[in-house]
C-alpha cells in the first residue's frame, strides 16, 4: 500500500482550516516522482511542523479551504 506513496517535505504552515480547526493547511515540496520539485498545498490532520516528510497517495490535487457545507 505504501509503495504508491510519494514523499513530500513540509515547507510552510499556512494555517488551520475546517469547522473546528481540526486540519492544518501546509505547503509541501514533492521529493520524488513525476511531480518532483513541485510545491502544492495540502490539508493535514494531526501534529505537523516544517521539515516533516509526508507520504502522499497522490500529488495532483491541491487543497482548498474546508468549510461548513
UniProtKB/Swiss-Prot annotation:
One Pfam family cited in the UniProt record for this chain: Ribosomal_S28e
Q: Name one GO biological process term.
A: maturation of SSU-rRNA
Mind listing the GO molecular function terms for this protein?
Answer: structural constituent of ribosome
Q: Do the record's keywords include Lyase?
A: no
**InterPro entries given for it?**
NA-bd_OB-fold (IPR012340), Ribosomal_eS28 (IPR000289), Ribosomal_eS28_CS (IPR028626)
Q: May I ask which residue range the UniProt record assigns to the signal sequence?
A: none
Classification via PROSITE patterns = RIBOSOMAL_S28E
| UniProt keyword Protein biosynthesis, yes or no | no
- Record keywords, A-Z: Ribonucleoprotein, Ribosomal protein
One GO cellular component assignment for this chain's record is: cytosolic small ribosomal subunit
- Family according to the record: Belongs to the eukaryotic ribosomal protein eS28 family.
Q: What PANTHER family does UniProt report for this protein, alphabetically?
A: 40S RIBOSOMAL PROTEIN S28, SMALL RIBOSOMAL SUBUNIT PROTEIN ES28
User: Under what name is this protein listed?
Assistant: Small ribosomal subunit protein eS28
